């Protein structure tokens, strides 16, 4: 590559942060100081950014021209971007959200595949390394208050690393909530940050508590505020077992009725698997708490409601959710799991030759169900001799 000598390349953000924490990091975000879009293209970079110039090199890494931002309207889209060649590295880092994300290392060279060789020197104009060592989340500048997404990001990083949040950053986030900045967040963006938190974090409940403390939960997810204390312990248990995002979501809304749960997650633009598991978990919890008799007929009816014969994974996840919520449900969950296992292979071929020849339509389903009920009844009579399944 042939760039003028004043053009400099730096890796920034997550890579520098996570290397200092001795964590694996797949983020390779680069900043280019002093270059123009034309220079980048002439040197084989492919432009991909629409709002501001971002380029890919042969290794697939992103290189963005150094830029400054100026707030011109409400919300996280309301920024005007300046990527003039005079923008310095420090000016680019100054626009970033947190001090721990505002560090850089210079690129010294590249190998034949486009992978960068880096300087060992940490460029750290805002003391992010000290905040990492102290376990503290701190904003770089008051420009933090111009982007409501940064509230969610700050809390996400705090939950991810178990860090404290600097008092001045807490105060700024509370001001942003009072000023209505979070009202401009779209459901899609809230879900994206929420999903990242539950994927990365070992303390989802702490994230929700911090949202509540600053008043953001009342704006973003008011329906779950009342039930939050009851799900703190189940969430901690689920986090400890590295449960999926869908399981954690189902726990969060398990106190709500089925209709409300489905509406809640659909409004938050959650994927279908999250909505489905949350709905079935709320249904099963209500059944266990208010109307469980444990008859063979009810067990079969519940298995069918869980689509257990078509989606055994969904059933297992639902049983995990309700046992996270209440350990007392473990025995009943085991009964359901075993009943599904011993009846899953009962099908049309299990009927007598006469039944196969004469039954039609729903009569076939009724006959199959009768066989399943018979099998479950036999199991219930002898289940004290059977093993159990752990969820």
Q: Which stretches of residues belong to each language-model region?
A:
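Catalytic cores of the polymerase beta-like nucleotidyltransferase superfamily
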Residues: 1-391
């Amino acid at each position: 590559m042939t760039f003028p000598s004043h053009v400099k390349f730096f890796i920034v953000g997550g890579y520098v942060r996570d290397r200092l924490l001795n964590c694996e990091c797949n983020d390779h975000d680069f900043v280019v100081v002093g270059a123009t879009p034309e220079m980048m293209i002439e040197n084989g970079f492919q432009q991909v950014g629409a709002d501001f110039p971002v380029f890919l090199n042969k290794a697939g890494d992103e290189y963005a021209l150094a830029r400054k931002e100026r707030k011109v309207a409400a919300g996280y889209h309301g920024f005007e971007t300046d990527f003039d060649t005079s923008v310095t590295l420090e000016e680019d880092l100054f626009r970033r959200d947190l001090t721990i994300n505002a560090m850089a290392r210079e690129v010294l060279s590249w190998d034949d595949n486009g992978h960068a060789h880096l300087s060992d020197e940490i460029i750290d104009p805002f003391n992010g390394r000290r905040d990492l060592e102290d376990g503290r989340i701190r904003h770089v500048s008051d420009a933090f208050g111009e982007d409501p997404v940064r509230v969610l990001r700050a809390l996400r990083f705090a939950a991810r690393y178990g860090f404290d949040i600097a008092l001045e950053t807490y105060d700024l986030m509370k001001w942003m909530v009072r000023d209505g900045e979070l009202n401009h967040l779209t459901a899609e963006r809230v879900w994206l940050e929420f999903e990242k938190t539950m994927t990365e974090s070992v303390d989802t409940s702490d994230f929700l508590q911090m949202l509540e403390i600053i008043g953001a939960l009342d704006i973003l997810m008011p329906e779950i505020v009342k039930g939050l204390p009851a799900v703190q312990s189940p969430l901690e248990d689920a986090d400890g077992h590295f449960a999926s995002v869908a399981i954690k979501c189902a726990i969060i809304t398990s106190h709500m009725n089925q209709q409300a749960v489905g509406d809640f997650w659909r409004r938050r633009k959650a994927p279908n698997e999250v909505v489905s598991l949350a709905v079935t978990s709320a249904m099963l919890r209500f059944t266990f708490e208010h109307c469980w008799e444990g008859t063979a007929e009810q067990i079969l009816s519940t298995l069918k409601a869980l689509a257990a014969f078509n989606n055994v994974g969904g059933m297992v996840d639902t049983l995990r959710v309700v046992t996270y919520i209440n350990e007392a449900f473990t025995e009943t969950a085991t009964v359901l799991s075993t009943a599904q296992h011993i009846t899953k292979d009962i099908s049309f071929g299990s009927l007598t030759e006469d039944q196969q020849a004469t039954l039609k339509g729903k009569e076939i389903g009724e006959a199959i169900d009768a066989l399943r009920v018979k099998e479950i009844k036999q199991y219930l009579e002898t289940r004290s001799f059977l093993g159990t399944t752990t969820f």
